[in-house]
Amino acid sequence: MKIVSSTSVMALVTAAMVISPSVTLAASHSKNLASDDFVGISFWLISMALVAATAFFFLETQRVSAKWKTSLTVSGLVTLVAAVHYFYMRDVWVETGATPTVYRYIDWLITVPLLMVEFYLILRAIGQASAGIFWRLMIGTLVMLVGGYAGEVGYIDVWPAFIIGMAGWAFILYEIFLGEAGKMSANHAPESVKSAFSTMRWIVTIGWAIYPLGYFYGYLASGDPAAAAETLNIIYNLADVLNKIAFGVIIWNVAVTESEATS
């Protein structure tokens, strides 16, 4: 029988300390969820799923070898940061009916770079990944997020902002498919890592394609503003739970597979 390591326990305690004030503050300032408030319900369900995923990833670090612990810990940090922000976003939505744009982009400015770090870490675990891979992924991420934020808060027109954001995303896709990161995975990774890297790439391709749909329905399509806000938040919420938790599960799977193969 395996005993939960003190490191895993400490990680869980730290996560609980981070999440608890957010839950308490959100609960003390919010109204009850209406039975027909599907956006608010989605915020709550996803925040709970993110908390559960955080506990899972932190506990599972004890099952993997040392070179995979950082990757799995980063997966837990992604879901932890997202969970905290989702409690606040839910509170904003339930109280005001407004889109919690600022909280959402603060979340993305932390979690999306961490997701890109996962590509770098998984390559570093199987060889010498260059710093250039890391910085190119960071640059693409920041261009994508800054463009989207500028359009959503009205700093620039929504169409130019959309194009800037899409350009950042395209730059990321180039790096992980055709750039140095993609070539390193194809030429040097074992089959389990290669499969995980490929799945992660398709999440960034297909899973991230959900976000432009939310932006389009929220800001570029004509129609009722209230309905547009609901559609935008539902789409963003579904995209977040898919991309952040699924990403972590892929990392967990390859970490456990590789660790057991070498043990």
PLM features: residue spans?
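Polytopic alpha-helical membrane-helix bundles and their juxtamembrane interface segments
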Residues: 22-104, 120-263
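N-terminal secretory/membrane targeting signals
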Residues: 1-26
